[in-house]
Amino acid sequence: MNKNEKMVRSLMGTVVSNKMNDTVVVRVERRVKHPKYGKFIKRSTKIHAHDKGNEGQIGDIVTIRECRPISKTKSWTLVKINERAEKVE
């Protein structure tokens, strides 16, 4: 890695909304251990990500990475679509 490059955080999640122009809402799940009982619990976060070509559809599994702030709520951008959602007709 060059000294000019820096590590960029990337996450994987599911698209839950694509109603905005150039934006998708991605739900990222993580597993957290309960402090007292030790059971693993699913916790999720909804992140607004920039989707330049409006390619993300609801149900797609996508990879997003952190970037400069694009708007008040968007600091992530869509990198690639790992798995497309099944079409329901």
Swiss-Prot record:
Tell me the superkingdom of the source: Bacteria
Q: In the record, which residues are listed under signal peptide?
A: none
| GO BP annotations listed | translation
Q: Extract the SUPFAM superfamilies matched here.
A: Nucleic acid-binding proteins
Alphabetized InterPro entries for the sequence: NA-bd_OB-fold (IPR012340), Ribosomal_uS17 (IPR000266), Ribosomal_uS17_bact/chlr (IPR019984), Ribosomal_uS17_CS (IPR019979)
Enumerate the PROSITE patterns for this protein.
Answer: RIBOSOMAL_S17 (PS00056)
UniProt keywords, alphabetically: Ribonucleoprotein, Ribosomal protein, RNA-binding, rRNA-binding
Q: Which GO terms describe its cellular component?
A: cytosolic small ribosomal subunit
Q: Name one GO molecular function term.
A: rRNA binding
Q: Pfam families this protein is in? A: Ribosomal_S17
- PANTHER family in the record: 40S RIBOSOMAL PROTEIN S11 FAMILY MEMBER (PTHR10744), SMALL RIBOSOMAL SUBUNIT PROTEIN US17M (PTHR10744:SF1)
Q: Which NCBIfam families match?
A: PRK05610.1, uS17_bact
Q: Which family is this protein grouped under?
A: Belongs to the universal ribosomal protein uS17 family.
> Tell me, what does this protein do in biology?
One of the primary rRNA binding proteins, it binds specifically to the 5'-end of 16S ribosomal RNA.
What subunit structure does UniProt give? Part of the 30S ribosomal subunit.
Q: What is this protein called?
A: Small ribosomal subunit protein uS17
Name of encoding gene:
rpsQ
